[in-house]
């Protein structure tokens, strides 16, 4: 088949050259072969799929030196001024087999919170939506009817952070007076006792990954008091306290290989062994507070056993035994993780980002500069190939998720960009800003897809449901908005 495609293209007297396919990790596919210089991505797709010999042909994108082959190989080679006397390496990348469409309209404006909405989060399958607010409540919203479902009262101060367990059965919330509460989304009732111990407010929450423990028993919290605590949610007690940071811990990630990562205003990131709390290494390099960080595997960890490609119109709870869920979560994690360990990206008040391989090395892989103001949030795309960073400089920047190389700036907001969220297929990005708008960006085209005005004031929180159906946003106007295509 591959030979037939190449033969067919050989008719006519066109300049030809030798090319070699390889995957992102540098693994060669087949031997070098000869193609016409004007070969198109469609033809490359046929050849590459024939070599891969998959049952179902995969949608693929092709690159030469980071530049995508869009119209023909020749045009890309010209733009990159590549030596064509040598073998040209073409990198192939499988693309998501499903496609998320950009949201275009607000379908509901949900009132209920009496103060600003500080956080919004969809559950791992997209079945439930939760929000945390300055009015001290957590609210669950019914997505089939887009109406308020439960109002959860228990906190006595602003709810600053919320996080879903990866099985979607519990939501943890942390507040300004240092307490962590757990909620059942199907009843709106508190689960177990209030987890107390932190002396200052909660800055982040992160659950043990589903593939490590399908019971979703442990959750970690970070606080302005400089510590990280790991809680046993079944027993309702603190399992261990990780101390070592000298200032506020700003964010926290529970990785998929048994490590916990904490970032702090003391300018460091600490890597801990989750099961016994031993400090493995300290990552240094930032010149100011570390505000935000993300893992290359975040999306797989967040969604656990849920596969966005198999989403149905009405989101359901996950079905299957704990063993089956664990296996599904494990295979999804390993697919995104790839051969090397998970990567971490951190963003700081010093306007820079660093890319790390924290399981192996305390030196950064790359220092990423270009933002003109502090960085609010950084996120890897679900397929881990691109890093997006949102900043007070009004821009969102895109970077290569493996090398940290700068790719593009997305401009359009007229004030600080607070939060961003990826669509499950890694093709779109939504951003919420102090300018009161949301914007949806086409990442490949590096341009604005849709502009979503509607909020009356700053937008603090935004999330895109893992099933791709909805975007939720909240902010200073106390309103929760749901956007659909």
Swiss-Prot record:
Keywords carried by this UniProt record: Acetylation, Notch signaling pathway, Nucleus, Phosphoprotein, Repeat, WD repeat
WD repeats: 112-151, 154-193, 197-241, 244-282, 327-366, 370-409, 412-451, 454-484
Location (main, coarse): nucleus
Localization terms from the record: Nucleus, Nucleolus
N-acetylalanine modifications at: 2
Disrupted-gene phenotype: Embryonic lethality prior to 6.5 dpc with death of inner mass cells. Embryos implant but die shortly after.
Tissue: Highest expression in heart, brain, lung, liver, skeletal muscle and testis with lower levels in spleen and kidney.
PTM sites of type Phosphoserine: 79
Any one GO cellular component localisation term in the record: nucleolus
Pfam families named among the record's database cross-references: NLE, WD40
One Gene Ontology term from the biological process aspect of the record: positive regulation of canonical Wnt signaling pathway
Function: Plays a role in regulating Notch activity. Plays a role in regulating the expression of CDKN1A and several members of the Wnt pathway, probably via its effects on Notch activity. Required during embryogenesis for inner mass cell survival.
Protein name, entry field: Notchless protein homolog 1
Organism encoding this protein: Mus musculus (Mouse)
Encoding gene per record: Nle1
